[in-house]
Regions:
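N-terminal helix-turn-helix DNA-binding core of bacterial DNA-binding proteins
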Residues: 2-43, 49, 64-74
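Amphipathic alpha-helical dimerization/coiled-coil segments
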Residues: 2-3, 74-129
Length: 129
């Protein structure tokens, strides 16, 4: 019971609710999350750290990036999913977050396309590294 109470206290703040909502849409790094939320890196990092510590978020390293996502399993994962389900998605702030999220995903897509265009000829060699 204490684990759930701690998690509930952790999401009792507007920025953390927004992060939980965004991170239910996929994995994002801190830089992307600052763009989506329109907040500073130290502030976003502090919220992410707290939410990961109480078990609402999973984090993993991919190269030099640390990616975050909403935890799916366990009691805190179920709690996070239930809270996201209760959010009023027509809220203007959440709609703005979704617009920025789409922009971040489009930027990712364009960067991947540019990388593969630039490296297509050497792709087999790159994959073998």
């Amino acid at each position: 019971m204490e684990e759930l109470l701690t998690a509930l206290r952790a999401v009792g703040e507007p920025t953390r609710l927004r992060l939980l909502n965004v991170l239910s849409q996929g994995e994002f790094n801190v830089s992307e999350l600052t763009q989506i939320l329109g907040q500073s890196q130290p502030r976003v990092s502090r919220h992410l750290k707290l939410m990961a510590e109480v078990g609402l978020l999973d984090r993993h390293k991919e190269g030099s990036w640390v990616l975050f996502r909403r935890r799916e399993g366990g009691a805190t994962g179920a709690l996070g999913g239930a809270i996201v389900g209760l959010l009023e998605q027509e809220n203007a702030v959440l709609e703005r977050d979704r617009t920025r999220l789409r922009e971040v995903l489009e930027t990712r897509r364009q960067a991947a396309m540019a990388y593969f265009r630039a490296n297509a000829a050497d792709w087999d060699r790159i994959r073998s590294l």
